């Protein structure tokens, strides 16, 4: 398992033209299959007058959750070339949607493959590629009297607090780079009265 992965920073767009057909490509970061599907649906609705809305996505640091669609184009001429660009750039947590406006001239199988590949590539290159750390969460409980010690670790390590509850027995869930969680687990476990939940 890798602690790092590459994705795009935000939405980026590329436009490829071939024989009067226009290919509008959009690359967008996503964190789940559901989010990718929502993005695909949004573009399909927005560009409902287009001939085709082809797409591919890759999810997860292991890059093992992926899918692509030719959306009516000949099999293997759209979705696979889009997915191929995701693989070429070694990206994950990304969806690329390519909208085709047909220009009246057929491109043939090889022409379609080139067009969808180039459109996807242009969308990726138009954006910024980020190298991100895989994130993990750590949940624990602690007595209220240990609050200062817990907060010192949180501030010193610049941790993102996801959830917290304060009472006689307090609870907290933090998020950090996955490779730092084992050391943080030890730090929090060393604070008097602290119990690690997960």
Question: Where are these predicted regions, by residue range?
Answer:
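Conserved short beta-strand edge segments in small beta-sheet-based binding/regulatory domains
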Residues: 160-165, 191-198
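Short glycine-/aliphatic-rich beta-strand segments at the starts of folded cytosolic domains
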Residues: 128-144, 172-174
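Short amphipathic alpha-helices in soluble, non-transmembrane regions
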Residues: 150-156, 183-192
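Short amphipathic alpha-helix segments
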Residues: 140-159
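Non-DNA-binding regulatory cores of transcription-related proteins
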Residues: 2, 161-178
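Helix N-cap motif at beta-to-alpha junctions
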Residues: 32-33, 143-147, 175-182
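C-terminal regulatory domains involved in ligand/effector binding and gene-expression control
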Residues: 1-76, 163, 190
């Amino acid at each position: 398992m890798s602690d790092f992965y590459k994705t795009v920073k935000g939405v980026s767009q590329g436009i490829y033209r071939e024989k009067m057909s226009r290919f509008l490509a959009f690359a967008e970061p996503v964190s789940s299959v559901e989010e990718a599907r929502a993005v695909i649906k949004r573009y399909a609705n927005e560009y409902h007058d287009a001939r085709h809305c082809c797409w591919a996505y890759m999810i997860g640091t292991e890059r093992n959750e992926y899918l692509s669609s030719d959306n009516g184009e000949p099999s293997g001429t759209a979705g696979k070339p889009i997915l191929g660009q995701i693989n070429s750039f070694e990206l994950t947590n990304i969806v690329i949607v390519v909208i085709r406006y047909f220009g009246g001239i057929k491109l043939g199988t090889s022409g379609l493959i080139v067009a969808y590949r180039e459109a996807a590539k242009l969308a990726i290159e138009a954006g910024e590629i980020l190298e991100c750390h895989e994130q993990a969460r750590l949940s624990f409980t602690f007595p209220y009297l240990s609050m200062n010690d817990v907060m010192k670790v949180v501030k010193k390590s610049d941790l993102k607090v996801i959830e917290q509850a304060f009472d006689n027995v307090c609870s907290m869930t933090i998020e950090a780079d996955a490779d730092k969680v084992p050391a943080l687990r030890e730090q929090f476990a060393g604070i008097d009265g602290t119990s690690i939940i997960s």
